[in-house]
A protein has these predicted regions:
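A short acidic, amphipathic alpha-helical/loop segment
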Residues: 36, 61-64, 89-92, 112-122, ...
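Extracellular/periplasmic periplasmic-binding protein-like sensory domains
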Residues: 113-168
Length: 168
């Protein structure tokens, strides 16, 4: 048998019993991705956007983020963000350190609506440095405006990486 770890399902996989596709689902890897994000935030102000999430995996992400932020004693603010009235978001941005926005969802419409809203108001506090940390699934979205990703200094985290310094 041959393992095909990445890529789209196609007829080759369906028609050949000796081929199978192995890919790790997000519900298994989200903790690793969130840990990597938070490892990068020790000297930054985390702005965790609480979007009244209803999806089970998004709720798991939010819960894990809150637990880890508390456990690590990180500087963080949790904002009940609403794209229609975003002023409370601007008020909590700090000017003495970088603000890292965490949006714990993979729902394309939710991500797109909220980051477009944030990008449109971020200039109200030009002295605040802002970065958006996101999940690798965001790269597959068809409605995301690339300019918004750049304006928010977006970094996408993934478990699919090689550490060339690790000898094992």
């Amino acid at each position: 048998p041959m393992v095909m770890p990445f890529g789209q399902m196609d007829s080759t996989l369906n028609d050949n019993p000796y081929l199978y596709q192995a890919s790790v689902i997000d519900t298994i890897t989200y903790k690793t991705v969130i840990d990597a994000m938070l490892d990068d935030c020790s000297d930054k102000h985390i702005v965790l956007l609480d979007l009244a999430l209803r999806n089970k995996s998004d709720i798991q992400r939010m819960t894990y983020l809150k637990e880890e932020i508390a456990k690590r004693h990180l500087d963080a603010s949790i904002v009940a963000y609403n794209a229609k009235s975003p002023q409370n978001f601007i008020d909590i941005l700090k000017t003495d350190k970088e603000n890292v926005l965490l949006l714990p969802t993979n729902a394309e419409a939710v991500v797109n609506t909220n980051i477009v809203s944030i990008a449109s108001i971020i200039d109200q506090k030009k002295e605040a440095k802002v970065s958006l940390y996101g999940f690798c699934e965001w790269m597959t979205y068809s409605t995301i405006e690339v300019e918004v990703f750049h304006k928010l200094n977006t970094q996408l985290y993934s478990t699919f990486a090689l550490d060339y310094k690790d000898p094992y």
